[in-house]
């Protein structure tokens, strides 16, 4: 009976690059038998550190925080770390366990980590807080990754494999560039930031059913159906790579707008309190707080895909064709305007106040609207993807691969500043609308303003990989280059 290794096509993904030193990275494994059960246990441990090599850029720090930028919703990382400081000092481990009985087996993978810099050290602007965060975004923790059963079989002489459980499935030929064919699994972004990270640490397995089957000696088919949806885990707010500060779970008090002057906010609240329109200042004096509403996660059902692969002997090349329907793993920032009744109260108060102090009326209306609006994170559903790929080896031994992907309805994030200022559209002071042109988007009282538009996106990319043996005392040097082109249509 001919079988194939069910783990032979592990995903390739972009690695975050930073100045990092891996101080130790021992790896070891053991094999064992329990009667007729074959087992293996592999482990990898590492200790590493990363440093900031540039001073904070004032243009990326909001004016309310002493910089020159227009927003303070994405500057915490610049305020927390100075040039020369470590932003990560981490110990981590990852372990694989496989148990196999004949052609059937189970595979488990888990990891743990502890970042001493983020967990134990004090930060200059905002301390790193793990409260309410996703486990994978925390400064320390442990997580079960893969957990699936598999069975290898053959129909005649044609091998096949089936898997069920939490797993990673990789399609396409991308190595570094994202948003290509490989979109089945979400990403643990934080894991890729850590020094000494491995690809298997940063891919988030999800529950799915997966089947692969050879149809001929040269043609094979694959398919999957996901049983659950999961999201990409982004950097915790305030960490070195965090961008922006308002998306990660638990980072609910970081979206602050308008004035950060305490006296001005107190004056505005004195005016607004009588009408029940008080606003909340940011805990870090960054401005007036815009509340975060509940996330709107995608549904679990409706995610599936199919692939065909053909190996052309005469060309020594494998070709692939793919179709996938999936829900976004990436967060979209969206807004919800103040309710119609709240806007009516704001406009009534501002109109009466304008007879006494027009400037204060406009400020009060803007503050009350912002402080009584909210934002939310959502994940658009039913994204369709079509793809083609090839992979070959050139006569000089260089591996050459490439792919093209097409999404007719990919969600593209709108400018978040436009989303926020669109919430001021309904402000009306004595019939005048002072913020009518504050945004290119149109906001309405109490209505959702979805922060994306569906666009056609086509992406081409190609990769070259060459191995050089026995270089400068190393057994092998790997040189990888990748180039891509992305077109956003109407």
Residue ranges and their predicted role:
Residues 32-73, 106, 110:
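Transmembrane beta-strand segments of Gram-negative outer membrane beta-barrel proteins
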Residues 37, 73-77, 87-93, 140-145, ...:
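Residues that define the transmembrane beta-barrel architecture of outer-membrane proteins
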Residues 39-47, 104-110, 160-162, 221-223, ...:
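Transmembrane beta-strands of outer-membrane beta-barrel proteins
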Residues 43, 93-99, 108, 146-151, ...:
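Residues on the lipid-exposed face of transmembrane beta-strands in outer-membrane beta-barrel proteins
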Residues 47-53, 103, 112-116, 166-170, ...:
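Transmembrane beta-strands of outer-membrane beta-barrel pores
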Residues 59-78, 119-133, 185-194, 237-290, ...:
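Solvent-exposed loop segments that connect transmembrane elements
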Residues 100-256:
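Outer membrane beta-barrel
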Residues 101-104, 154-158, 204, 216-218, ...:
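Outer-membrane beta-barrel channels and translocator barrels
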């Amino acid at each position: 009976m001919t079988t194939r290794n069910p783990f032979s096509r592990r995903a390739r993904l972009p690695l975050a690059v930073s100045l990092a030193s891996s101080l130790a990275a021992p790896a070891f494994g053991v094999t064992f038998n329990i009667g007729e059960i074959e087992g293996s246990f592999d482990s990898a441990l590492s200790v590493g550190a990363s440093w900031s090599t540039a001073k904070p850029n004032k243009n990326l720090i909001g004016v309310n925080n002493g910089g020159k930028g227009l927003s303070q919703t994405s500057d915490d990382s610049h305020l927390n770390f100075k040039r020369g400081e470590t932003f990560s000092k981490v110990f981590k481990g990852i372990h694989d366990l496989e148990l196999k009985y004949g052609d059937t087996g189970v595979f488990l993978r888990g990891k743990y980590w502890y970042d001493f810099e983020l967990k134990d050290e004090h930060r200059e602007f905002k301390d790193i807080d793990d409260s309410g965060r996703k486990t994978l975004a925390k400064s320390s923790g442990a997580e079960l990754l893969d957990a699936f059963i598999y069975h290898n079989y053959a129909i005649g002489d044609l091998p096949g494999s089936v898997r069920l459980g939490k797993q990673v499935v990789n399609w396409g030929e991308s190595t570094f560039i994202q948003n290509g064919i490989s979109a089945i699994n979400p990403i643990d972004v934080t894991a890729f930031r850590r020094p000494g990270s491995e690809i298997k640490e940063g891919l988030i397995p999800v529950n799915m059913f997966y089947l692969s089957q050879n149809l001929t000696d040269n043609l094979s088919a694959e398919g999957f159906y996901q049983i659950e949806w999961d999201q990409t885990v982004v950097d915790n707010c305030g960490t070195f790579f965090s961008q922006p500060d308002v998306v990660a779970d638990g980072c609910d008090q970081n979206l602050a707008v308008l004035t950060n002057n305490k006296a001005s906010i107190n004056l505005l609240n004195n005016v607004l309190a009588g009408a029940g329109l008080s606003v909340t200042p940011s805990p870090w004096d960054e401005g007036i707080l815009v509340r975060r509403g509940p996330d709107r996660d995608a549904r679990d059902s409706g995610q599936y895909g199919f692939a065909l692969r053909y190996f052309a002997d005469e060309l020594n090349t494998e070709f692939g064709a793919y179709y996938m329907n999936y829900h976004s793993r990436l967060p979209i920032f969206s807004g919800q305007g103040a309710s119609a009744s709240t806007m009516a109260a704001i406009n009534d108060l501002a109109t009466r106040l304008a007879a006494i102090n027009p400037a204060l009326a406009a400020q009060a209306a803007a503050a009350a609207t912002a402080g009584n609006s909210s934002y939310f994170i959502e994940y658009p559903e039913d994204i369709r993807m079509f793809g083609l790929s090839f992979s070959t080896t050139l006569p000089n031994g260089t591996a050459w691969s490439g792919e093209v992907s097409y999404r007719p309805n990919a969600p593209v994030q709108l400018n978040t500043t436009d989303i926020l200022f669109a919430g001021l559209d309904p402000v009306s002071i004595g019939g005048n609308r002072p913020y009518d042109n504050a945004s290119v988007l149109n906001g309405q009282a109490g209505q959702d303003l979805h922060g994306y538009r569906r666009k056609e996106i086509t992406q081409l990319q190609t990769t070259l990989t060459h191995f050089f043996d026995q270089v400068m005392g190393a057994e092998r040097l790997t040189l990888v280059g990748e180039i891509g082109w992305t077109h956003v249509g109407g």
